[in-house]
Amino acid sequence: MQENNYLKSYLNLHFIVFIWGFTAVLGALIKIGDASLVWYRMGFAGIFLLAYLFYKKQSIRLPLKSVVKLVLVGFLIAIHWIYFFKAIKVSNVAITLAMFSMGSFFASILEPLIYKRKVLWYEVLFGLIIVAGLFIIMQVEIKYLEGILYALFSVFVGVLFTLFNGKLIHQHDSTVITVYEFFAGFLFVSVYLLIDDKFDAAFFDLPGTQWLLILVLASICTAYAFTASVQVMKRLSPYTVMLTTNLEPVYGILLAYFIIGEDEKMSMPFYIGSVIILATVILNGVIKNKIKGKLP
């Protein structure tokens, strides 16, 4: 019975990672501005998660000090997603997701600073290898430089909010803090759109197919994927989760090629550079797991 539950959780994790990969494809298929897309995503996802908490009859009250921190993290999430979708729209899904493998490199730099731990030599070495993989991609895909830079900035901000969340997640329920973060990000983007005078009739006048894609993005790819991933992480080891989530760029790039088509076809050096980055990230996880296993 326990073996069946493990297999079910493992397959569910792959499904969640598949959904995360599909998020990038939706970003390319939804034909509205990046900030507008994030506004819809955070607003609807926040409502769905809030409804889920009400259904569970769970309190959402938090200390004011924690709320202030969550609001700041929510701003970071909004900025992260805005530049994620901006990168997709000025380049493509393949470029954007390949850059997201740089997350572990940024984490190896930022984590020692935020958590005040020593820098590990092999993380620096792997970071240099990842930069080499990135250099190969940039040499042959220089026409996508703007998208590469947007994606790298998005990854950097994403690592920042993940590390901050790493501290908050131990203090409060993960779904509750996400609701606060989503609505804070929604408010932040709302202010930006108001200042930029984007809220007009055309903003809400979208074709039915676009509304459908937005709802899929907010419900399945955001609210559901988040709550399901939290449940899965309770049953699987962090190592298994980490290795599996590294497949997100692979799933996303394959989905983009089959759904969007030739625009997602890249040169051979791009795939070589992407494989170097992905393999290094996975090797980093394997070594970390072995070192952790040797600790008393």
Residue ranges of predicted features:
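Specific transmembrane alpha-helical segments of multi-pass solute transporters/efflux pumps
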Residues: 56-94, 100, 136, 218-236
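C-terminal-most transmembrane helix of multi-pass membrane proteins
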Residues: 42, 210, 246-296
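Glycine-/small-residue-enriched transmembrane alpha-helix faces in small-molecule transporters
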Residues: 1-39, 75, 79, 83, ...
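Helix-helix packing/entry segments at the starts of transmembrane helices
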Residues: 40, 97-102, 165-186, 222-258
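Transmembrane alpha-helices of multi-pass small-molecule transport proteins
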Residues: 32-79, 104-107, 157-164, 179-197, ...
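Hydrophobic transmembrane alpha-helices of multi-pass small-molecule transport proteins
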Residues: 49, 71, 119-138, 189, ...
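Transmembrane alpha-helical segments that form core, pore/gating elements
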Residues: 17, 25-28, 49, 107-108, ...
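C-terminal transmembrane-helix exit sites in multi-pass transporters
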Residues: 53-56, 103-125, 250-271
